[in-house]
From Swiss-Prot:
Sample GO molecular function, one term: magnesium ion binding
InterPro entries on file: G_OBG, GTP-bd, GTP-bd_Obg/CgtA, GTP1-OBG_CS, GTP1_OBG_dom, GTP1_OBG_dom_sf, OBG_GTPase, P-loop_NTPase
Domain of life of the organism encoding this protein: Bacteria
Intracellular or extracellular location(s): Cytoplasm
Pfam name, any one: MMR_HSR1
HAMAP family registered for this protein in UniProt: GTPase_Obg
Domain OBG-type G: from-to ranges: 160-333
Keyword Endoplasmic reticulum: no
Gene this protein is translated from: obg
Domain (Obg) ranges: 1-159
Subunit structure: Monomer.
One GO BP: ribosome biogenesis
Region: Disordered, residue numbers: 362-392
Name of protein: GTPase Obg
Length: 392
């Protein structure tokens, strides 16, 4: 299945149903008072995280989703039916962004998490709501309010504990094949990896972590060169980044310069991502003797002004790979993922109960209204269905 990690869709919540103007007219009760019902609320639009999905391909062609409108009110004090909600299923790790305001509406990072992205309109009021001691036959009603409509940008960010960085052909796909059951394509030409892939590394029977492999970066990636930095967003939720470096590049390029290129592109993309814990791992030491590999790594670190804090591995032969994986597992356990801070709900400025009260209080009565035929013909007793006539 094609990997799609971005989608732009149009969502429309349902409008609220209108109120009804109606009067009770039955045998022996010719003027029984107002009985217009309220409309129904419009349907909402939700997103729900589904662990069985791993791509946004479902939203590549179908891009418009609309909830049902609320029904209008009817006579006999019948309230209109509420519009049906719609729920869109997305992969775990999806972020919802308002495309117009660029506001992040939320992240769906757990299976079954449900998020409201468009609120349906509220119902209008029927004329029965407006009856009072001075207005016994009201002809006022209110219409339902429009539902929210927005263009929604969906971005899928893979949930992994470890992310891998490096130039093309640094051995990232070979490494993930060596430590997990994932089988990304491996070849001796650049950009063999075209889409991100995930693998589960099991250190022992009870401990494991998820590792993400993304396409390699090249110089100028932040400006769109190569595959660009489009896939770097998949590393934003990782505990630690593994910077894989070919210690003996076949093109005879300088590994120190290659490290500097990746570091520079990372900082240009995101300072937050650049400040994540990052481990330097020299790969392909099987092409050199142990002494030569150690000497070359020390020379590179001295030129970069860094400490002797690095790993020497061979993903192809598996040399020192187990040690690296166990150290990664220990680091993850010592630094658990921080839960997102819960934001206290803020009091909304617009309250529908207040809105309805305002609609009722803003009604204006004129002398023409009071001189109408129905103004003084209805009494409280009519609501019981029997007209009471008092003997003089």
């Amino acid at each position: 299945m094609k990997f799609i990690d971005e989608a732009l869709i149009r969502i429309e919540a349902g409008d609220g149903g209108n109120g009804c103007v109606s009067f009770r007219r039955e045998k022996f009760i010719p003027k029984g008072g107002p009985d217009g019902g309220d409309g129904g609320d419009g349907g909402d639009v939700y997103l729900i995280a589904d662990e069985n999905l791993n791509t946004l391909i479902d939203y590549r062609f179908e891009k418009r989703f609309a909830a049902e409108r609320g029904e209008n009110g009817r006579s006999s004090d019948c309230t209109g039916r509420r519009g049906k909600d719609i729920t869109l299923r997305v992969p775990v790790g999806t972020r919802a962004i308002d495309n117009d305001t660029k506001e992040v509406l939320g992240d769906l990072t757990k299976h079954g998490t449900k998020m409201l992205v468009a609120k349906g309109g509220y119902h209008g009021l029927g004329n029965a709501r407006f009856k009072s001691s001075v207005n016994r036959a009201p002809r006022q009603k209110t219409n339902g309010t429009p539902g929210e409509k927005r263009d929604l940008q969906l971005e899928l960010m893979l949930l992994a504990d470890v992310g891998m960085l490096g130039l093309p052909n640094a051995g990232k796909s070979t490494f993930i094949r060596a430590v997990s059951a994932a089988k990304p394509k491996v070849a001796d030409y650049p950009f063999t990896t075209l889409v991100p892939s995930l693998g589960v590394t099991r250190v022992d029977t009870s401990r494991s972590f998820v590792i993400a492999d993304i396409p390699g970066l090249i110089e100028g990636a932040s400006e769109g060169a190569g595959l660009g930095v489009r896939f770097l967003k998949h590393l934003e939720r990782c505990h630690v980044l593994i910077h894989l470096v070919d210690i003996a590049p076949i093109d005879e390029s300088d590994p120190a310069d290659n490290i500097a290129i990746i570091e520079g592109e990372l900082f240009q993309y995101s300072e937050k991502l650049a400040n994540k814990p990052r481990w330097l791992v020299f790969n392909k030491i099987d092409t050199l003797s142990d002494e030569e590999a150690t000497a070359r790594a020390k020379n590179i670190m001295q030129r970069l002004g860094g400490e002797d804090d690095y790993y020497l591995i061979s993903a192809a032969t598996g040399k020192n790979v187990d040690v690296l994986c166990r150290d990664i597992m220990d680091f993850i356990e010592e630094n658990p993922r921080q839960e997102q801070e819960k934001i206290d709900a803020q009091e909304v400025k617009f309250k529908w109960d207040d809105y309805h009260q305002e609609q009722l209080s803003e009604q204006v009565f004129t002398e023409d209204d009071q001189e109408g035929d129905d103004w003084d013909d209805w009494s409280e007793d009519d609501e019981e269905g029997v007209e009471i006539i008092y003997k003089p």
